[in-house]
């Protein structure tokens, strides 16, 4: 059992701004009474009474020296609170249960993947890419489809049947008409949830509906590109009325699927289901053209798997080439995630000589003539 002393508080980092950390103190910490000075305090014992729920903190120099990073979502120990100024110092970071690098969030429990069924229209390839990226985190995935009021019930059923074949049960919502917002709130209760999805699908509007008076900036869909404009610039956790924290993340339209070629197949529920009832002949099967492959077959996202596999192989090859300075090819990423190899220019051969080097060369020449 972890032991704290009086003057130490427990909380969660909800925002990072430069070298400052906004820490939300635990509810039980804020509600329970104080103890005598110098007395040890256990996690199951009353902690000091806190006049404030949020403190703006810095990181102790000791943590900087040992390279301890502080992330949004981290459980931290805060000491020496200045209640008048609303300040404190982070003395320790508790062990993380989970960690995401992009976006940088610790201790997340699940991903709420938000897409729209219309305006912008639902793109199966883009959705598939987001789903695979979400699967790579190891977190539970909750898929919700916004703007359901813009399509008929028949279209909703077609979309639902299609996604069920992918291995996902979508929840149709409408922020505009407050459809199924209460049901979404039940999924988020007492958990740290990361909201993800492309720009323009209504992520910020959904958060505004779930957390009244938060007033997140909401953008419109670009008429020319039929894509949303970015309105979220950084990662921040917001407290839900019924408990739990919600992380709004910057929207993007084509997430990187940066897993290894060998791992990729396990991020498709359809492929996992096939591998659960049969095995491939070869242990290193890539599920492309090998004989007696259990994965290859007539399932809709198999073509997506092949495209993502080609990207993963190209990325792995690029890493090998970066480690090999003698390589004569380099991988260039073009539009829409397409990649191709190009000849690598000889190092420094085509670099213009600096004026300083030219002057030094002339000085050496004069010295030789003398």
Swiss-Prot record:
Predominant location: cytoplasm
Residue stretches making up the CP-type G domain: 97-255
GO biological processes: ribosomal small subunit biogenesis
HAMAP family noted in UniProt: GTPase_RsgA
Annotated Pfam families: RsgA_GTPase
Signal peptide: none
Coiled coil: none
Subcellular location(s) of the protein: Cytoplasm
GO MF, one annotated term: rRNA binding
Protein name as catalogued: Small ribosomal subunit biogenesis GTPase RsgA 1
Reported function: One of several proteins that assist in the late maturation steps of the functional core of the 30S ribosomal subunit. Helps release RbfA from mature subunits. May play a role in the assembly of ribosomal proteins into the subunit. Circularly permuted GTPase that catalyzes slow GTP hydrolysis, GTPase activity is stimulated by the 30S ribosomal subunit.
Positions that bind Zn(2+): 280, 285, 287, 293
Cofactor note: Binds 1 zinc ion per subunit.
EC nos: 3.6.1.-
InterPro entries, alphabetized: G_CP_dom (IPR030378), NA-bd_OB-fold (IPR012340), P-loop_NTPase (IPR027417), Ribosome_biogen_GTPase_RsgA (IPR004881), RsgA_GTPase_dom (IPR010914)
Gene behind this protein: rsgA1
Naturally occurring in which organism (per UniProt): Nostoc sp. (strain PCC 7120 / SAG 25.82 / UTEX 2576)
Region annotation (Disordered) ranges: 325-370
Cellular component, GO annotation: cytoplasm
Cofactor: Zn(2+)
The keyword GTP-binding belongs to this UniProt entry's keyword annotation: yes
């Amino acid at each position: 059992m972890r032991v704290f002393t009086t003057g130490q508080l427990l909380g969660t980092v909800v925002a990072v701004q430069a070298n400052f950390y906004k820490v939300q103190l635990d509810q039980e910490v804020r509600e329970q009474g104080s103890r005598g000075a110098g007395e040890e305090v256990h996690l199951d014992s009353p902690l000091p009474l806190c006049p404030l729920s949020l403190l703006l903190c810095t990181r102790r120099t000791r943590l900087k020296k040992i390279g301890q990073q502080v992330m949004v979502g981290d459980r931290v120990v805060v000491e020496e609170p200045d209640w008048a100024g609303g300040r404190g110092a982070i003395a320790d970071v508790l062990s993380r249960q989970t960690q995401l690098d992009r976006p940088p969030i610790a201790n997340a429990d699940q991903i709420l993947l938000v897409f729209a069924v219309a305006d912008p229209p639902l793109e199966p390839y883009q959705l598939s890419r987001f789903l695979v990226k979400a699967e790579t985190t190891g977190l539970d995935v909750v898929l919700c489809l916004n703007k359901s009021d813009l399509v008929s019930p028949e279209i909703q059923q077609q979309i639902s049947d299609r996604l069920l074949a992918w291995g996902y049960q979508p929840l149709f919502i409408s922020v505009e008409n407050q459809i199924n917002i209460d049901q979404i709130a039940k999924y988020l209760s007492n958990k740290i949830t990361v909201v993800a999805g492309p720009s323009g699908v209504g992520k910020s509007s959904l958060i505004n509906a779930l957390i009244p008076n938060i007033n997140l900036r909401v953008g419109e869909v670009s008429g020319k590109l039929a894509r949303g404009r970015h309105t979220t610039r950084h990662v921040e956790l917001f407290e839900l009325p019924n408990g739990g924290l919600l992380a709004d993340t910057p929207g993007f339209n084509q997430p990187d699927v940066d897993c290894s070629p060998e791992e990729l197949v396990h991020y498709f529920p359809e492929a996992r289901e096939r591998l659960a009832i049969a095995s491939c002949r070869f242990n290193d099967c890539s599920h492309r053209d090998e004989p007696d492959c259990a994965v290859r077959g007539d399932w809709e996202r198999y073509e997506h798997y092949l495209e993502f596999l080609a990207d993963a192989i190209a990325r792995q090859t690029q890493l090998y080439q970066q480690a090999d300075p003698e390589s004569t090819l380099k991988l260039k990423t073009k539009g829409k995630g397409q990649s191709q190899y190009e000849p690598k220019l000889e190092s420094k051969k085509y670099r213009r000589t600096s004026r300083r080097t030219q002057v030094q060369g002339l000085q050496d020449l004069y010295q030789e003539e003398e």
